[in-house]
Design a protein with these regions (language model features):
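Outer-membrane translocation/initiation segment of Type V secreted surface proteins
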Residues: 367, 514, 518-526, 532-547, ...
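Outer membrane beta-barrel transmembrane domains
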Residues: 734, 738, 791, 820-924
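Extracellular beta-strand/loop-rich repeat segments of large surface/secreted proteins
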Residues: 270-273, 279, 288, 292-333, ...
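Outer membrane beta-barrel translocator domains of Type V secretion systems
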Residues: 623-793, 797, 903, 908, ...
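Extracellular beta-strand/beta-solenoid scaffold signature
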Residues: 31-64, 73-94, 99-133, 144-179, ...
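Membrane-embedded beta-strand positions of outer-membrane beta-barrel proteins
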Residues: 384, 388, 666-670, 708-712, ...
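Gram-negative bacterial Sec-dependent N-terminal signal peptides
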Residues: 1-27
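Solvent-exposed, glycine/polar-rich loop segments of beta-barrel outer-membrane systems
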Residues: 156, 251, 256, 634, ...
């Protein structure tokens, strides 16, 4: 049993002195009915009150009106729980409301003259024996009952009188120790919790025992699950309206609303002898309205020392003590996706360290009084100068968000500690937030928007959490900002002021595109070594875009990785190379900072990374970007396709001179190959496959036998390097001729027209996809002069010299990331000296097999440059190479044959890892 005694304070219920009780024989089960708590029958001068929740027992001084289990009911008026706590075993101090609507409120106050000022009908002081338990399940308590209107008949006149109830509180107003559960889609219009009972300290001070403190704590618990809590109303909302419509208690932010009218939860700890501590948990619920917390020092606490200890009346307090105080507390937790829109406002009393003498008294249980909080306005010494921040507060108000919950602040909020955990978020816009400390963990966010302001002694961002200032009018001030373990402070467009910026374990200061001056010290949490391979290595990250700049005015120490976040295809080398992005103004010889590159960024045609040069950090140029590399590789890769087509036609003409007689005919050939290219600037890997079909005939004339024909080629290529990719399509039309003279000298020649279509794609350093396409027209030629030396009728050895060239027109185009490619004309020449050797095996005159071998020296000459963003970049490939090949031709009949060969070419800027063609021909 709790021996709480009713405090001697004036009741807030003005109507308690006007209502009469309507006594009934027993408590009524009103479940399934509509019930009115007020009534009037014109026989009495005041209305009757039927609203007590009570147990039915015969020896009670009060007979109950409502059985304390209400289900599927509609109640109009005010329900009082005052008489539920009777101290009798078996009768719980509990009220359960389910599947019901209460058009009004629940209060723990006395509602009639029979118990005014906390004195029951038997003359004893009302006490709280047991904790009160309130369960609201799938129900609504809307605080809409503002008046009881009743008609009074006076002779021939009927007058309407009003009994005001709007000032009694909001939907749930309790001054007793309570455990409240609101669940299952319930809707409550405001909750007020006050401290109505206390257990007294042993007073007054007697010089021997002192004051024996009562260590009892007045506690309340509130759990709101899967439900809605809104603001209630303390004002008469019926005195104003808009087009005939008055405001509802649940309306938040109304023009005429008082602070109490906008409150969803009010917790008021009074100057009793005991502390009041409340926990409020919102689980998967919505709160719309302010949460107000007020606290004063306990009754026997003296800010400047207890005068009762001056037993000698000489003005000296002996011992010097503040007396007794228990810290009031309100802990609010939002969890599992709960959302709160409103302000958190705290009103407490505090003393500085100079006023802290101790608690308790000598020879009893004296102990020193110590600070329990800090004060934003600071503490001062006797000369009026700032002495510190530590204070002893009468109460503490803490807010925690967990598991994806959200708080959208309104007005001006001031609390002690704010913790934001597990992907939860706090949004401050057109409002302010003052907190002693703010901590974000596990990917949580603090967003400061338009006209939003946040001030704190310490802001701690941890484990990939993020604080961002999204508008120019956003402000953040903190004496110390710590960004830890991959978390990020994004300056955005707002203003950040601090004395000490700590970036540790990969914590990020994101400057973006700002030209920002940080007037603060910058350091790591632990600066021990610059060796990144050691376990105690610590570092922070400074993130910028290429057009951003950070200047630091303060002592700078520690290790920092500089990350370039943006990527673009626009801009020339002059726009980026050696551009300053960080400058440190630190004249302290005892501090040193190391800046290293965190990444490479695609800017224009090249990648860049950060490089420290003394007190500055600049952009250092590196290799080509993937998309620029692909764009510059396209002409060379086009040439590779064309060279394979030249080889395919060359094989057709070579085979016409060996094996069975060839008078011309129709042929078709598959060709393919794989290439690796690297000229020190561009590099790529290429796969090619295609088909050629041709038709030719033999003509005699001019002391030679001529084969003259035409061919069409179709090929697909795939170019790749890192994230770069090009899909190629080509179509070729070619005419060719081969003349074999009587002295076994031959001359092969060809002319061609080719159209190349290339679709380019890549991923930039920031993950952005980029693409583009280009179409190129090209003309080419080929000539091969050789001598067919036949040591016998079956064998041959053919030395030869060849020249070929492809001339591609320039196609100016732009990629999706704004990189411009101009002047892409590309000329390629190939010179070749080699020898072919083979032997023909005849089988019965109409079948023959001719295996052969190739060996050649090849020189490629493609000295070309391309303009990208007005910078000329070498994309030519050249160099000497060796070609080695093997092949065979088999004649099934004198008219039908098949052939195949494979070659390798390596040594120059482009290596052909393999090339092959497989064909068939039908001769006339």
């Amino acid at each position: 049993m709790q021996t709480w005694k009713k405090k001697l304070v004036v009741s807030q219920l003005a109507l308690a002195c006007t209502l009469a009780i309507a006594s009934q024989a027993n408590a009524k089960d009103i479940s399934g009915t509509t019930y009115n708590t007020f009534g009037y029958d014109n026989t009495a001068s005041t209305p009757w009150y039927y609203g007590y929740a009570d147990w039915d027992y015969s020896d009670a001084t009060h007979d109950g009106d409502i059985y304390p289990v209400i289900n599927k009911s509609t109640v109009n008026g005010v329900i009082s729980t005052y008489y539920l706590d009777d101290g009798v075993n078996g009768r719980a101090n509990a009220l359960s409301i389910s599947n019901s609507t209460i058009n009004g409120m629940i209060t723990s106050e006395c509602m009639t003259t029979t118990c005014a000022e906390g004195v029951d009908t038997d003359g004893t002081t009302h006490t709280q024996y047991d904790r009160f338990s309130l369960t609201v399940d799938n129900s609504t308590i809307n605080d809409t009952y503002e008046h009881y209107a009743y008609d009074v008949v006076n002779g021939d006149t009927t007058e309407t009188h009003y009994l005001d109830t709007y000032g009694l509180g909001n939907a749930i107003t309790l001054d007793v120790e309570s455990d409240i559960v609101i669940q299952n889609n319930s809707q409550i219009a405001g909750i007020t919790l006050t401290q109505g009972y206390q257990e007294l300290d042993n007073t007054p001070y007697d010089g021997v025992e002192g004051v024996a403190n009562s260590s009892n704590i007045f506690t309340d618990t509130l759990v709101v699950k899967d439900s809605v809590l809104t603001s209630g109303a303390y004002s008469d909302l019926g005195t104003s309206g808009f087009y005939g419509q008055t405001a509802k208690p649940s309306d938040y932010g109304e023009t005429n609303a008082t602070a109490a009218d906008d409150a969803a939860l009010i917790v008021a700890a009074s100057a009793s002898d005991n502390a009041m501590q409340t926990t409020a948990t919102f689980d998967h619920s919505t709160v719309t309205g302010d949460i107000l917390f007020s606290s004063t020092f306990d009754n026997n606490f003296y800010e400047n020392g207890d005068p009762a200890t001056d037993t000698t009346e000489d003005g000296v307090y002996n011992p010097t003590t503040n007396g007794w105080d228990g810290t009031d507390k309100l802990d609010v937790t939002l969890t599992n996706g709960s959302k709160w829109v409103g302000a958190a406002q705290s009103s407490v009393e505090a003393i500085g360290t100079a006023q802290m003498y101790g608690q308790g008294y000598s020879n009893v249980d004296w102990h020193a009084l110590s600070p329990n909080s800090i004060w934003p306005d600071s503490t001062f010494d006797s000369n009026g100068h700032v002495a510190g921040e530590e204070v002893y507060q009468s109460g503490l108000f803490n807010v925690a968000l967990d598991n994806g919950s959200e708080w959208d602040t309104r007005k001006i909020s001031n609390i002690d500690a704010l913790t934001v955990n597990n992907q939860s978020q706090v949004n401050v816009e057109n409002s302010g937030l003052l907190a002693d400390s703010i901590t974000l963990t596990n990917a949580s966010t603090l967003n400061i928007g338009d006209s939003g302001a946040v001030a704190t002694d310490s802001l701690y961002l941890d484990s990939y959490s993020r604080a961002a200032l999204t508008e120019e009018t956003a402000e953040l001030y903190a004496n110390t900002i710590t960004v830890d373990n991959g978390a990020e402070l994004a300056l955005g467009l707002g203003q950040v002021d601090t004395h000490n910026m700590v970036l540790t374990d990969g914590g990020v200061l994101n400057v973006a595109s700002r030209d920002y001056v940080l007037n603060s010290d910058l350091n790591n949490a632990r600066y021990i070594t610059n060796d990144s391979h050691k376990a105690d290595y610590d570092y922070g990250v400074v993130a910028l875009n290429s057009d951003g700049h950070l200047a630091v005015n303060g002592d700078v120490a520690g290790n920092y990785k500089v990350r370039i976040d943006d990527a673009t295809g626009a801009g020339s080398v002059a726009d980026y190379k050696n551009k300053e992005i960080i400058r440190v103004y630190d004249n302290n010889a005892d501090t040193a900072a190391s800046f290293t590159a965190a990444n490479k960024a695609d800017l224009g045609a090249y990648t860049y990374q950060a490089q420290q040069k003394g007190d500055t950090v600049v952009l250092q140029q590196e290799e080509l970007t993937d998309y620029a590399n692909m764009a510059l590789s396209i002409p060379s890769a086009n040439t590779n396709i064309w060279n394979l087509q030249q080889d395919t036609v060359g094989t057709r003409l070579t085979n016409s001179r060996h094996g069975l007689a060839d008078n011309g005919g129709a042929w078709v050939s598959y060709f393919g190959g794989n290439f690796d290219a690297d000229n020190g600037t561009v590099s790529y890997d290429q796969d090619v496959s295609g088909i050629m079909v041709g038709l030719d005939t033999q003509i005699d004339g001019n002391n030679a036998k001529w084969i003259v024909g035409g061919a069409a080629g179709f090929a697909k290529g795939d170019i790749s390097d890192r994230t770069g990719q090009v899909d190629q399509d080509s179509q070729t039309a070619m005419i060719y001729a081969s003349a074999k003279f009587m002295n076994d000298i031959f001359l092969d020649s060809s002319m061609s027209y080719t159209r190349f279509n290339n679709d380019l794609s890549a991923t930039m350093s920031n993950g952005q996809y980029v693409d583009g396409n280009t179409t190129t027209d090209a003309v080419g030629f080929g000539m091969k002069l050789g001598y067919d030396w036949k040591p016998n009728l079956s064998g041959y050895v053919t030395p030869y010299a060849a020249i070929s060239g492809l001339f591609q027109s320039g196609d100016d185009y732009q990629l999706s990331n704004d990189m411009r490619i101009d002047g892409q004309s590309y000329d390629s020449m190939r010179y070749e000296l080699g020898v072919d050797a083979g032997y023909t095996f005849n089988y019965g005159g109409e079948q023959a097999l001719t295996p052969y071998f190739k060996l050649a020296y090849v020189y490629d000459d493609a000295d070309n440059n391309a303009d990208i963003n007005n910078d000329s970049i070498d994309n030519g490939v050249e160099g000497s190479a060796v070609r080695v090949g093997l092949g065979t031709q088999f004649s099934f009949t004198k008219n039908f044959s098949a052939y195949t060969d494979a070659t390798y070419l390596g040594g120059g800027d482009v290596d052909q890892n393999w090339g092959a063609n497989l064909g068939v021909k039908y001769t006339w």
